[in-house]
Amino acid sequence: MVKVSMVVQTDATNPGTDISKIIKSTNTIYGQYHFMMENLVCVTKPTEEGLEVHTCTQHMDAVQLMTSRALKMDQNKIDVHVRRLGGAYGMKISRTSQVAVACNLVAMKLNRPCRFIQPLTTTMRAVGKRLPCSNDFEVAVNNSGVIQYINTDIYEDNGYMLSELLANFGNDVYNNCYDKSKWNYKCYNTLTDTASNTFCRSPGTLENIAMAEWVLEQISYELDLDPLEVRLANLDTKYNELKEITETLKTNANYTTRRAEVDKFNNENRWKKKGLRFALLRWTPVGGQTLDVNLSVYHGDGTVVITHSGIEMGQGINTKAVQICAYLLKIPVEKIQIKANDTIIAPNGYVTGGSITSQNVGRGVKRCCEQLLERLDPVKAQMDNPTWEELIVNAFNLNVDLQAHGFVSLAETQVYDVFGATLAEVEVDLLTGEHEVKRVDLIEDVGRSVNPEIDIGQVEGAFIMGLGYWTTERLVYGSNGEVLTDRTWHYYVSQAKEIPLDFRVYLRKKSYSTDAMFGAKASGEPPMCMSVVIPFAIREAIAAARSDSGINRTKWFNIGNIAFLYIFRVT
């Protein structure tokens, strides 16, 4: 039995009347496992103060709080330590608390160390995935494909219970970058018989942005119009940055020439076809954070130590913090070190996630540096162009406090939009069902990047994770809700032969967010949403083949995100 409850409803404010066609359809996309290098682990040992917990979590405060409640221990007797994570993608926000509580219970009861390592198969069976999602919509358009009104009902599958309000994360982007005044939007939470689903890279936003892009794609098919022109015709005038981004991408990707080449290839080949498709993006970060940052300078050699509430899990948060500190203090990065995190130096810290922690840690580091420099300025004024080491020694001798604290609160939430555009070229072998991603060109607006190499790496990683989601990763459930694809023998993530042969990432130039974040924007989740361009390109290739078989090219067919070889046989 499926239980349904409404999350939010938004009504159109300016529907149109120039209606030449009404399209009704349903699109469904499915779950995704957070395929991490490091599974759920915890090591706990009793101490004279209580418990020393070493675990792999994105949320130290949650582990400490849940352990306190479950074991009826005071929080000040539970010290949670995290050095770094071997990947997380959202699973380690809440699900690590279950593992940690079990491990901590054993350590407390037996008064001896306990190590808990959950194997991959158990994790894939017991722990929830990305929310599957269905969209029932009715859209009315004119002859140019401009939306007059759209009624869209989004159903998010939370599993057997509602443990996190993930559907709310997509409420600001359900229309993506298109004219919001035409959209009647309803979002529902549903309960089914699978494990309770959880955060997964771009939770809520991927589903809503993909569904919006799906609608625009179907409009272009059924009216036989250029898909990019349909998108631009429906673009909200508030987001004109996307026109500039799209033109830049068309130029960089040599779109006009390649469009003609793809059409020529499809006309000359019967058993291999190509698709060339666009996807646009407007992504907005959700919520804020509570973060502590501490900066200490050692008087003997002037070296600097930073601790903060953020968790390093491959996104480069520590590297960016060091860069910001070195820039503001005008010292070499070699003199700065980031220490491991724990609930002693960073109590009550918010979860690391949502692609906002690197920016907020940077804000905290900036405040620490500003405090320290303010204290050092009077000392420096009395000296003749001192070195950093000389300045610190003199300041210490004058009893200057060489430790600073920066606090970032929920009240300081920054609101901005991340824009992007992607063009993908895919070739499909109609005899085997195999496909090859020939080339991907992607532009993302990351603001003024603190570290372009890290941001490009984040863009590439997120897109490839999305590529796997749309093409190779297929979750299969038994009739009782049991996961049958619980290992790499059955569940396939993108590997060397699935990634694009030619992958070109561009960062938008002359972009800026706010001074508080050095002009930087999020980079780790938005590209995940743009990966929907891959099934669009695959569908165009299949449509070309169907056309050769006498099937009307404007006849829509769904392929969703079920593993491509499977859906190819169905199509």
Question: Where are the predicted features?
Answer:
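Structural alpha/beta core scaffold segments of enzyme domains
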Residues: 1-443, 533-550, 569
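C-terminal structured "cap/appendage" subdomains that terminate the fold
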Residues: 518-535, 539-558
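Generic long, charged, amphipathic alpha-helical segments
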Residues: 334-340, 493-521
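Short conserved micro-motifs at the rims of enzyme active sites and ligand-binding pockets
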Residues: 289-292, 449-453, 515-519
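Metal/cofactor-centered catalytic core regions of large enzymes
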Residues: 238, 414-420, 441-496
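Short terminal or interdomain "cap/linker" segment that borders an active site or interface and mediates
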Residues: 562-571
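Short, contiguous acidic/charged loop-to-helix segments that flank catalytic cores in large enzymes
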Residues: 309-313, 454-458, 525
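A glycine-rich dinucleotide-binding beta-alpha-beta segment and adjacent secondary-structure elements
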Residues: 271-283, 486-503
